């Protein structure tokens, strides 16, 4: 049909002759049924976390090949599932399939492997956290966002510096990289409550729609994408519905629709009213 589909990892290895020249021992593990990333869900995240955990003591680092559409969701989820990490878990992929002449897959994968194997002078991993590597940049996994569906600069971390930039050599920003307590064991948390909704505020938003969403009996969390520094329309019904949900034990987190900047609900009156209604700031 000409449509892009997931492929078996063996096909990738057949096209990646450069892998043999790396001074790194690489083992591979392939899921039996490759999955388009648009079909990822929390059960798949938990499975990935368990795969890492089951092999954690056998390897110095992990590279996960993942479709770009939901890669940022997976990297963020894994960053909370894999607690007390002392080894890199790096997600990467490509915009063009590896068989195409201008593919970005080779550089992304080869550099990800090198970063996953990188150690400091004491033999500790340079980047012991969940990350995304793409187009020369290593990003914190729970700060990365897919920003481009066409170019090779697919991901960006708007409110947090790159952990490493890959040029002729690697430039690590050590003071921005998590430093783990190496005495603590890996703590894997795979239980997630999926009764969460994300909705964006917009001028003219209707009470009947918001009321219907917030009235869901199993609702446990709301991510509200608000205006600017965390503001919302000062409609009394919005504040009442949010307050009622908060009183029922629903966690409501306020994030901005802006790509950069921070939620400061105490800055303007509309934001202060959200705070009074029990809404929690998502900061940056």
Give the location of each predicted region.
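Short glycine/serine/threonine-rich phosphate/pyrophosphate-binding segments
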Residues: 1, 69-75, 105-109, 231-234
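Accessory alpha-helical/coil subdomains and C-terminal extensions
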Residues: 5-20, 140-229, 234-235
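Structural motif
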Residues: 60-61, 221
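Short beta-strand segments
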Residues: 64-66, 90-93, 131-135, 200, ...
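Short Gly/Thr/Asp-enriched flexible loops that form oxyanion-binding sites at enzyme active sites
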Residues: 64-87, 234-241
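Internal gly/pro-rich beta-alpha loop/helix module
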Residues: 91-168
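C-terminal non-catalytic interaction/assembly regions of soluble proteins
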Residues: 226-284
